[in-house]
Amino acid sequence: VSISSSEIEELQRISLINNLSVCVDFEYRAVPLFLQTKKLIDENILGDIYLVKLDWLMGSRSDPKRSWNWYSLEEKGGGVIGALGTHAFDMLNWFFGESINVSGKLATSIKKRPLPNSSDLNDVTSEDVCFANIEISNYSSNLIPCQVSLSSISKNGRGFSLEIYGSEGSLILKSENQKDYVHGFNLKYSNNENKIQNLTADSSFNFEKTWTDGRIAPV
C-alpha cells in the first residue's frame, strides 16, 4: 500500500534489485470469523444483499496530548484511511465485489499535537475521521449500498462492526476490543424468523497456534 503509483513502482524496483518479495498484509482475510463470514456470503445464506454498514470507531488517537509523528502528516500516508480504511475497503472488495461509486467526507478533529519531548504544538494535516458512501457491484444485478464510518479519535468507541442485511437474513461481525485490532470478534446471524444465533468459525479455518498479541499473528 502506498500513497502514489510511483512509490509502488519504486518499491517493486528495490525489491527486484535485492531479490526480495513484497506483499500487502491484509491480515483480516486470515482471521477465522472473517473467513466464516466470507463463506456464508458465498453460500448465499443472506439472499440478495440490501445494505452493508461498516463502522470502525477506535480511540487510539483520541488523546490530544499524544505526540505528533508521521501519522499526523497526510503526505506521509498518515491518518485513519491508511490505518483502518485500507483494511476496510479491502474487506468490502473481498466480501462483496468492486466499489464503483464512492463519495465521502474527511475531517481532522485534533488539529495540533505536541512535538515529542516538547510543549510546542505542530499542525496535523491527516484525517482522523472518514465517512464514505459506496455502491458495490457484485454478482447480483443490483448495486449494493454501503456506508463506512472510520475514526481514530472515538474514545471508548464501539470498535469494529460490520452489518450485512439481505433478503433472507443478516450477519453482524463485531469487536469492541480497543486494545487489540484482531482478537475479540464475534459473529451473529439472524434469519427471517428473527432467530439470532452466535456463530463460530469452522475448524478448518482455525490455526494450530495462536498468539496473545494480534499484531504478531491474525488469530
Give a label for each model feature.
Residues 1-29, 44:
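Beta-strand-loop-alpha-helix segment that lines the small-molecule cofactor/substrate pocket
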Residues 86, 149-157:
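Glycine-rich phosphate/pyrophosphate-binding beta-alpha loops
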